[in-house]
Each structure stands twice: as structure tokens, then as C-alpha cells.
């Protein structure tokens, strides 16, 4: 691969030695390139350690230093270079990466000596010159001039003889050096070396001894020249410095680096850099090649004049395209500003305000991101030029951002962002020149955006693209040639954003565990647990620990870092020194000498209990436990002094009880006053009633205070050491969370982490990778319980269907909402052939489901459908709460389809199980499936008929008494129905018929499977696609909802091979899509989980998925979802409630609160949910020094610009017009987020743990192998 750089020239400012002739023609035939090192203020002088005072070039008559005797042989790759180009037959990607992405300045020089001239010629040196006399091994005199500066040269030409002296240059010359000598300080980001470094050996190798001898000989030659003057002294000093760097590189280099050094000298490749520069090893492994972008700017993308006669959607699409062009142009300019205004000046600055090594860390991968978007901008320019004729943009996004290189460079940048901000923050305090440089650049910038504001833009680029493509897709009509490509582009960007989120989470998890491990002694048991590799960080946050006195007064509070691991809870102090008397942090605290954290306590997770205010009695045994509050001096017996010790909110609870007692006394006084015969001042019924009303108002205020205090107060009961008598002592620790959302997250994760420690969840899921050791991610569903489906086991009833009826229970406490299953009731239907059917109703308003009602039916239940309340009726009811005719109100209902053709409607509000209305299907055909749409209740029958019951007004939603509208779909049974926005899909055999939603007129049909004997059994929709399962075969297929095109096919058997070895015949029996996960149930009882996109793009599967180790002994009869929405008022903190409408008025334009979503569950389930890239920047907020911000702070007294408060959310960039404002910081946005509690229920015969098949001990099944069983998985709250 030829170098794109021009031939190296002497740098400006360097001068040749007076009286020394220039390079001759023969010297130019030997273009030996120098090896480069970046200048750094962290370099140390190691020449004394080596005993080498100075070094100068040698004469050409001396024997060569390097002998090529052990060159590694590499198999040639004919694809690496086309024939006839003169490029070597094989190329090292790692070398190319080093050459292309090195952060140091590139410079080189040529030897200016000649064998015909018998005098010494001193070369023109630049600062970065290291190797000054590297001979070119076997130069090709006939090589054309275009190939002289090749980055790589053939070490062994094909068919060329190998001489004896060319067969060896062993790396043993450098094995006598250690990394410890002269090594500079460790970088901010710890990068593990690729290989172990060699040990220190003081004995020099023969080649280095020969090097020292030649060094002394050459020095004598220099002195003999008698060329004095200032220029000669400067050149000698530069030469000595560069040779010092060379010797230091030889001493501190790893074996891997020395091998590359040897190859570099042999090939004359200028890629050698210090091993500790961040990014070298990563770039070698990635194999990224630098894209040469011409300095000549291509024409900027610009839309031409708008043609006449455009439709409104075309006009909007042009405006959105203009926003894409403007946003991309601004983004590319921001990336260029980072390099031109900050990185390049910092690298060239003398003296350096920031070392080259730190510059590499701060600006890591910015150049590569710029290359990606420069190419995208060029393609965008050509697409904009032909917009009026094509109107296509989606395929450009797919082609540009589906490459793995884009994911790699953005992953490196995002994972390095926190470290870069840490370096900048520390440098602002330790180096005034650097802070002055940042201020000066900000003042000179046209928009006065800080470096932080520029560097945060790559993090939020893909959320901006997603928003723009969503708007473009909304304004692209069906049938447009750009619609499918836009949906595919939206899927690519969403998948890319999800991968970046997951990689960022894993990187933060590893970094936090490493920091925690450093704070623990090497001999402690906690250190062994943390370093075992079995610990997974579930949640980590900075909370405020509070300590109260005997009367409930706040004694002290301090910030703690709390770590929730998969099996333990750790609390640590943040190890930063306090401020001085001026209120400023000491400079010595910026670089901590010790660990970042100091562990205060840690405890096993099963022993941690969450205690809510007013619910202490049911949490622990007060008679056998002593309560010692954290920070208290003495432990007080809970049964004796607990009534006198009030802990914050419990004090409010006690005051509420006192008010209730006072109100009872005042009511008695009121009764006594009413018996008075005389009239007395201030002692009459009016005053007594005022007393009662005042006490009632105080009670309401106290209840609100308790409720508000409980929202952000996390009370944990921790085990302590027993006292002298052996009685256990428990410690109460109180943490204040930043917002109610944070507390919900802690309570939920603590609860699920405890469940995850059960035997059936160790492990609960397996990723079928090659090593079979991949850990399931933290968001993985956890098996919460396994219960019998029917209370009566006398008859072996078969499962038919299950639905969830959501009902909000106001009696549940704050933590109960976070830990319990989705509120509501489970309706489970089934039966037995010839023995009738049965319906079982379970209540989910408790930690474990319990049966509340069971009733028999005349025939087995084959299908069920939950029909929520209509949206418009719910809105009218919310506007006018008083209804004249309560019987006219339509409540949510449960519709049942039986084997004898009966269709029954039950009210889901109460559990009285009174049948509202019933009817019989045409011909008494068994009802195989039920679906509701805004216009009809649809029933698929056994004979291929589709029965549609229209909507009515009144207390019953559907007119089941009148004859239904019947439509023949096909000769076979209608097995499944799917209701879309404007269409209904009905399957019959291998074909699917698409019906118009209102008139049910057939629009078109297509063949989903080529085998006529196969039937479509399940259809689920996600985004713009429909996944289908079939009656036989191991595959599921994806079809487009608009073009009906077959997009993807997935073989489920490949995911279950290691669980069921030798099982060839596998069939999919159930499908479910929920929260970006596709659940697949099989006839062998195995459940497979596949990730799918959540947005309105194409829901294609890109990941490998997971397989559950918990399943059924028989086929998975159904998969159902239970979902409930947490009430929005639960998420409002007391401060937000106190602000009220005043806070809305105080917000600037564009930052007002969004309208509060309606809390009705039925409508929330149908509402589309979007995701965005959610990189959290909170990990830099705890660092000392000025906080970073992209905003221009308000100048105080004409002072220079300072850094203001750091933004808490990456989307809050309202000062920049090119940034799309999507949401606000976490603390203020908490009460507007929808918190969904989700559980997945599978039904089948018995319970089976597949862990025994992998060699682990199988768990004893709670039910028989033939009993109908429900498995309930609880999904972590999506916060």
C-alpha cells in the first residue's frame, strides 16, 4: 500500500550545516525514513542510565548495525494488492493502523552521505527524528521514483536468494531491558498490554555493545570536523535528545513492540511510537485504514429551488432533508474544530500545555469519526443534487452506517469520553496554561461553544439521526420508493445505538468494579470475591446517607457510593480530600494517591431488607432484633425504646397518629359541647367544628409529608454482629435518593437480585456462543415463580389461553409497586375433552400470585381476548366524572371462545364473574382465535370462516345477539388473526389474507410458506414487520406489513442444539413480542429469546439471542404478557409538587413540561414507545475541580469565561440551534417517564430445568410432569 504523503522534506526552520554540501543523487537512491516519536512533557532522560552520553551518525564505511537473519515469513495475500501496481504482496493491518492513526507529527529526512565523497555530511534534523542512520537493506536501483516512498516494502522478493547475513537479527538485543527503567507515569486510562514485558537484565547484548562503540567512534569524527558555532550546537542537542528517546524505547518496549521495531527498521516504515500511547494497540487490532480526504472541499450539499406543484408531504420532506443537510454540515464542522482549534495547537504548542500522551486520550477517535462523516457528506451532496427526481435518502443511511467500522470508532469514542473529560477537568486546575488556552479558544469561537460542547456532539449524533428519520418516515406515504429504505435505516441506527449503549454499560461496569477492587485490601475476602470474575454490577449510584437523633433531628449527612452486585451490597466513601479554608479543593486531591473509594461496609444480598415507613411491623421480628441506627452510639431495644426513637419519616408517622388521637378527643369534646345549655364565648359548636376541620387539614398535610418523604428515602435493614448475649443486631441505614425514580430503581433491582440468587436462576439463561460462558445481560427476565395453573388437580385439564386484566390497586405502598408483579388479574382458561372447561383467576397484587376465583364452563376454552376501554370514552369520562347513566359506561371486558362455538363476555373490573352476554358462532364451529379492532370483534372459526361482530353503543361494546358478518377466508381453519392500524390479517393454511379494517373487504393475499400442508399458526407485529410461526418446521419468518415482502428467516433449532442434542424435529408453538424481545416457545418446552428493534423500523433479528434453562416438560401452550403502568404522581418528588404551576412559568421557551400521559393502561399498551441513546455523564460529576459545560456562563464582574455547571443530560443543548432538544436532565425528567412493570407468563405441561442436561444439578419440579403449570418471568423496570 503506497503512502499518500508527498516525499519528506526538511522542516521549516531547520538549517543545514554551513559548508556541508547538499544531498547527492546517489544519496537520494537511499531514502531511509526516520522513525517518529511524539514529543511529550512527560519524557524522562534515560541516557545516564544507559551510560551513553551522545550519539552521532556513522560513516558508510562502518559495518552495518542490523543483520537480517530472522525475518518472519508471512504468507502472501494476493488480494491485498492488485497486480502491476508495485505494492507488496502482503500488508500488515496493524502497521497500517499505526501509520494511519498515530497522533504524533510526521517528519523524516534522508541520509546525505555518499560513498564517493570522503567527508562527513550532517543531516538536516527535525524534532521528531529518532533514527538517523538506518541503512536501506538491498535497495532496488531500478525502482521507479513513484515507489521510493512506499510505506511497506518487500522483505523477501519472490524467488530472491537469501544470503547468510540476511537470516538473523534476533530480538535478544533488547531482552535486557525492563519497562520499569525510565518509564513515564501511567496514563489516565489503564490499557492492558498485549503481552507480558520482559524482565530486567543488566547485561548488554553484543549488538548494543557494538552500537556503543560505533557511537563513540562517530562522536570523535564529529569533533574532528572542527565545525563550531551555534547551529552546530543546536543540531547536536537535537540529535542527543532523539537518540535518548530511541534508547528509552529500546529499554521500555515490550517483546511485541521490539518485534515491530525490528520489522520497521527492516522495512523503513515510520510507524514506531511509544507503547504507552493510547490507541496504538487498539488501532492495530481493528485494522482501520486511514481515508485520505482531499484538502479541496467538495461542493456543499444544497437543495435547489423548490419546484411547483409539490404535495404538502413533499414540502415537509424537503424541509426535513434541509435539516439533515444543515445538521450534518454543522456536525462535520464541529469535528474539524476539535482537531484544528484544539488538538493540533495542543500537539504543536511549546512548551506543551497538555502532553502528547494525554492529547491522544482526549481526542481519541475524533479523526476517524470525521473521516466517516466526510464520506457520508460527500454522498449526501450527490443525493441532494438529484432529490427532485429520486426523493430517496434511506438507502444512503443504510450504506453509510451499517459498516462495522462506524460501530468500532464510535464505541471507542463513547467508552473513552469519561476518561477524556477527567483529563480535561484535572488539567484545568493543574495547568493554568491549558485553562487559559480553553478560555481563549472559546472567546474566539463564533458561537462561544466550549470544548465540552463540541466533544459531546458525537455522543448525541445518532439520537438526532433517529429523530430526523422518524420525522421523514412519518411524512413518507405508503408505496413511496423511499419508505422501506427509511425503515431499514431506522433499524440500522437503532441497532447501532443499542450496541453503543450496551458497550458503554459494560465498560462503565468494568471500570467501577476495578475502582472498587483497588479500594479493598488484597488479603480481604471482598477482594477475592471481586476479582473472581463472577460478580456483575447491577446498579451503582451516589446516594446521601443521613443520620438522625433521638427526636428525629438530622445529625449529619454524607455522600456514599453504593454498589449493587448480583450477590452483595457494598457501601463506600468517596475518597476525596475536603476543601481548604477558602472553600476550594486542594490540588493534591486531584490525583489521588490512594484508592478512589474506601469501603465502609458490605453485606450479602439475601440479608438486606427494605423497610418502608409505617410498615416496620411486617418486615422483621421486633422482639428478637435490636435496632441500631447508623451513626448512633448505642443500640436500643426495639421493643422498649422504639416508641421514643423517631427516625425521620417515622417521626412524621408518629405525629400523624398523635393527630388522629387528638381528633378523636376533639370529636368527643364536640359532642360534650353540644350538650351545653348555656351560651359561652369561644365554646360553641362553630368553634368545635373549626377545631375538627383544622385537625383534618393537618392530617392531610402530614400524610402528604410522609408520602413525599418516602418517595426519595431508601431505608435498609442490614445485619450486624450479635451482642454479648447472642441476640442479633440489625442496623438501619437511611439513604436519600436523587429522585423518586432512583428509589424505584433501587427497590426493584434489590428485589430482582434476590430472586436471581435462587437455584433456578443460577443460571437462568444461556447465550449459545462458542465458549458457552457468556453471561446473561442485567436486563434479562428472571423466573419469579412457578405455580399450578388450576387449583383442582383431580382432572388433568389442558391449558387453552391466558390474558391479563390490568387493575391499579391504590392500597399498594411505594415499594410494593416496585417489587410486585404487574397489578391486575390473570385469567387462565382450559379444559378437557368431554369434561367441560374451567377458568382460573389469579390476583397479582401481591408478591406471589394467588387464586381468587374459579368457575366451570360447558366446554374447554380455546382462546381469550382482553378488550380495553375505548380511548374516546375514557377521555370523555375523565373530562366529566359524573355520568348520568352508569349502565351506559363500557368497562374493559374479557372475551372467551369455547370449543362448542360459544363466545362469552365477562367484565374484568370485578371478579364476580357474571357473564354480560353470550352467543353462538355460525354453525356452532369451534372458535380458534379472537381479535378486536376499533370496528369489529373478530372470531376465526374451524371451517375457515371469519365472523365479525360490529360495535354498538351502550353498556355492551359488541352486538353479539345479531347475526355476524361472515367471510370465508379459505378451506382450512382460521388459526390466527392480527389486527393492524388499517388492515386485518387472517391465516388459513399457508396463505394469509389481508382485509380492509372497516369494510373487511379482501385486499390481497400472499403465500407465507411454500408447503401446502403447513399452516400459519402465530402472527405477532413489531414496528413495520410481522413475525410468523408455522405448524411444522423450525423456522420463523418476517414479512413487511406494507409490501408483504419476505424479509428474514430464522432457524430456532440452531439456538437449542446445545440444550437438546440430537433433536432434529422441533416446532414453534407460541410467539410473543414485548419490549424489544421476541419470545419463541417450542414443542419441546424450550423458550428462546431474540432481540428485535423497538421503533417503527424493520424488526429484523441481528443478535444471537438466549435460551432459557427453565421450561416445560411438554409443548409451550402460550406466551402472554402482563403490563401495568405506575401512576405518574408516584414519580413526583415533594419539591416538584411544591413548585406546581409556578415552575412551568419559570421555564424558558422550549423547556416546558410535556403533557402528562394518560394513566389508563389499555391505551398505554397500544402507544408506541421510542428509545434513544442514553449515555450517562454522571461519572465525571464526582471529580474535583470546575464542572464542564458546553454553555456560555454568565460573566461575573467582567471576568473571563469560566466553566459553569455540567449538563446532566446529553440532550439538553438548547443554546446550540443545531442540536435537537429531546429531553431534560434525569432529575427533572423523572416524573414524566412512563414506568412499566412487565411480566411474561408461559403455560405448558409441568416444569423442567434444562441445567441438568448441561451437567448441573436439576431443580426439583414443584408440579408434576403432566400438570398444567405457569412460569412467570419478571422483567426489570425499564427506567
UniProtKB/Swiss-Prot annotation:
> Residue ranges under compositional bias (Pro residues)?
1-10
Instruction: Write out the GO biological process terms.
Output: actin cytoskeleton organization; positive regulation of stress fiber assembly; regulation of small GTPase mediated signal transduction; SREBP signaling pathway
- Where is each DH domain found? 316-503
Sites of the modification Phosphoserine? 40, 281
Q: State the protein's name.
A: Rho guanine nucleotide exchange factor 10-like protein
Quick one: where's region Disordered? 1-91, 159-197, 1135-1163, 1186-1208
| Organism for this UniProt entry | Homo sapiens
Q: Which domain of life is it from?
A: Eukaryota
Biased amino acid composition, Low complexity: 72-89
